[in-house]
Amino acid sequence: MRPVKLVIVGDGAVGKTCMLISYTTNAFPNEYIPTVFENYNSSLVVDDVKINLGLWDTAGQEDYDRLRPLSYPSTDVFLVCFSVIAPASYENVEGKWKPEIDQHCPNVPIILVGTKIDIRDDPEQVKRLAEKNIVPIQPPQGDELAKKIGAVKYIECSALTQANLKLVFEEAVRAVLAKAAKEPTGKKEKGGKKGCSLF
């Protein structure tokens, strides 16, 4: 079974932990629990390859900016998440998360993930957002941001309804497998076996 280390990053309260819990347990947590660092494991088969997926959850709050990179060494793929109903979290992908990943883990594949699409599609929720002058992020904006940051793919999902949730993790594994297929056998990247190190 091939091990793959996936680290999920993004602003606080964008739904990172809910994604992981919903994916690994098929149950949506009913309350917000701020994360410091949590690890989960999942086994899956992607394109006939058996994968032991190590899922590393991180805290998005600024208080953890110095601790969070401790979970980065040996990362195979990042999920960079933003909430489609929180434009500031979308802007922070380019302003904060991409630079942080580039500093610690250049050349590690990124999947850009737009979360909470169930809320964007709910007329009542959209009305509430409009009252706060919030316009939800739409798919073309996610596609554009993915190109800007060099992400392998942009996927939208909902941890609540599980729409596209499995696809997020399958595509993350595919990004790792595709990168491995392109690398010369036995060649190590600068900074360690996977091109991600801590300085």
Swiss-Prot record:
GO molecular function: GTP binding; GTPase activity; metal ion binding; protein kinase binding
Span(s) of short sequence motif Switch 1: 26-37
Bilayer topology term: Lipid-anchor
GO biological process terms, semicolon-separated: actin filament organization; cortical cytoskeleton organization; establishment or maintenance of cell polarity; mitotic cytokinesis; regulation of actin cytoskeleton organization; regulation of cell shape; signal transduction; small GTPase-mediated signal transduction
Binding-site positions, GTP: A13, G15, K16, T17, C18, Y32, T35, K116, D118, A159
InterPro entries registered for this protein in UniProt: P-loop_NTPase, Small_GTP-bd, Small_GTPase, Small_GTPase_Rho
Cellular component aspect of the GO annotation: cell projection; cytoplasmic vesicle; cytoskeleton; plasma membrane
Segments carrying motif Switch 2: 57-75
Protein family (similarity comment): Belongs to the small GTPase superfamily. Rho family.
UniProt free text on domains: The switch 1 and switch 2 motifs undergo large conformational changes during GTP/GDP cycle and play important roles in the interaction with downstream effectors.
Function in brief: Small GTPase which cycles between active GTP-bound and inactive GDP-bound states. Involved in actin cytoskeleton remodeling during capping of surface receptors and uroid formation.
Name by which UniProt lists this protein: Rho-related protein racG
Originating organism: Entamoeba histolytica (strain ATCC 30459 / HM-1:IMSS / ABRM)
Organism placement in taxonomy: Eukaryota, Amoebozoa, Evosea, Archamoebae, Mastigamoebida
